[in-house]
Amino acid sequence: MRIEVNGETAYCYTNSRDIEADKPTVVFIHGSGMDHTVWTLASRHFARHGNNVVSVDLPGHGRSTGNPLATVEEMAAWVIAVLDALAINDAALVGHSLGSLIALECAASHSDRVRAIALVGTTSPMSVSDAILNAAEADDHAAFDMLTQWGFSKRHQFGGNRNSGIWMIGNTLRLYERSAPGVLFHDMRACNEYTSGTDQAAKVACPTLLILGAEDRLTPVRSTRALQEAIPSPLVEVLPGAGHTIMVEAPNAMLDALHQVL
């Protein structure tokens, strides 16, 4: 589905269905340099379980036009504008990595529009190494290489996909490679500069779930302590054997966890 948001075309995957006013809505928000396709399994699953699903391409990503937004706050305002364009009063938000910060900011700043959030592969602050930032700014393929190597657990570096012949890291690498020049850098810089996450987390009033990979090297479980302490009564699921790219590494375990708040 293509809609107009702030004068640009925004693409939202809805499982080829119209938004129905009598159904709850789940919005899926992708991470840095990615697009809606990372949520294909999850969005189809929840569409088949009685929900409207809206899996967005952020501006400048995937099929959405416009330039990448500069800050997490701007991205959160854009997500709310998507809800407005679709005449959705409130929704549950599921975000991965950068998307988790966007979901957090939405819940803190627009509490009347958000009924629950699930933060997948998250932490706050979400610091990005100079090596990745510099490579991304230079549009150096090394940025993609580092993110795919560090973004998966060691066991999944060598396979582990239940679908024979499909390489986890290879698919994610190709997704990064499809992103437009500069997109990854804008996203990673937004993560790095969003320093108010724990303050905003204290304002969250809706049910909140953190889904973490036990072997995540980009947002390690130990780094989430401040976030867990700031959010009022969060649910926390740590998935054994999973790294940062949880949607790919542990899709079924992630779906099971999401049902706690969706």
Regions found by a protein language model. Give the residues of each.
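Short beta-strand element of the alpha/beta-hydrolase
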Residues: 22-31
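Catalytic histidine neighborhood in serine/cysteine hydrolases
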Residues: 221, 225-244
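Active-site glycine-rich loops that stabilize anionic/oxyanionic intermediates
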Residues: 31-34, 97
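Short beta-strand/loop motif that positions the catalytic acidic residue
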Residues: 204, 210-212, 216
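Flexible "cap/lid" loop of the alpha/beta hydrolase fold
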Residues: 101-146
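Catalytic histidine-centered segment of alpha/beta-hydrolase-like enzymes
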Residues: 242-255
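Active-site loop/oxyanion-hole signature of alpha/beta-hydrolase fold enzymes
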Residues: 7-15, 40-48, 52-98, 256
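Conserved alpha/beta-hydrolase catalytic His-Asp/Glu region
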Residues: 134-203
